[in-house]
């Protein structure tokens, strides 16, 4: 028996609808020119980890729960006296998602996590970097359903960067709008 491979809902939607809609809108000659999602990078900067190494490990464990993949603790590269920071001290954690896990995370972000943000009015449509990548910041990581609100000792902010193969911001904005990213009007 041949097993059918699991395909995330957003990937199927991209293959069936979004790809053809973007080709029609921008007039691509080749199917490989159509922008697609490349990766999603989640980053937590933990300033308190300088004094307490356990906080970096706790944040990495929470980020691993959110992402569904092991997070890596990041260390400082240079010493900065004003921040009382020495070289090779833990200062945060990060994880890079690709393929199926990326599509699953984006699905959870759009449909579950962002609606749980207090006073959410939409994402800033100007947060593109000029090369087709979108970045957003979240003030509390406890908006994700994987994090138990009662067991979470602290709530940390996090950065989410969605990297696409789009050449311009307009193409990337059209791609993310097709994925139902709730941009502000």
UniProtKB/Swiss-Prot annotation:
TM region(s), chain numbering: none
Pfam family, one: Ribosomal_L5_C
Key words of the record: Ribonucleoprotein, Ribosomal protein, RNA-binding, rRNA-binding, tRNA-binding
GO cellular component, one term: ribosome
Highest taxon in the source lineage: Bacteria
GO biological process: translation
InterPro entries referenced in this protein's UniProt entry, alphabetically: Ribosomal_uL5, Ribosomal_uL5_bac-type, Ribosomal_uL5_C, Ribosomal_uL5_CS, Ribosomal_uL5_dom_sf, Ribosomal_uL5_N
An MF annotation (GO) of this entry: structural constituent of ribosome
Family from the record: Belongs to the universal ribosomal protein uL5 family.
PANTHER family: 60S RIBOSOMAL PROTEIN L11-RELATED
Function in brief: This is one of the proteins that bind and probably mediate the attachment of the 5S RNA into the large ribosomal subunit, where it forms part of the central protuberance. In the 70S ribosome it contacts protein S13 of the 30S subunit (bridge B1b), connecting the 2 subunits; this bridge is implicated in subunit movement. Contacts the P site tRNA; the 5S rRNA and some of its associated proteins might help stabilize positioning of ribosome-bound tRNAs.
Record text on subunit structure and interactions: Part of the 50S ribosomal subunit; part of the 5S rRNA/L5/L18/L25 subcomplex. Contacts the 5S rRNA and the P site tRNA. Forms a bridge to the 30S subunit in the 70S ribosome.
NCBIfam families in alphabetical order: PRK00010.1
Record-given protein name: Large ribosomal subunit protein uL5
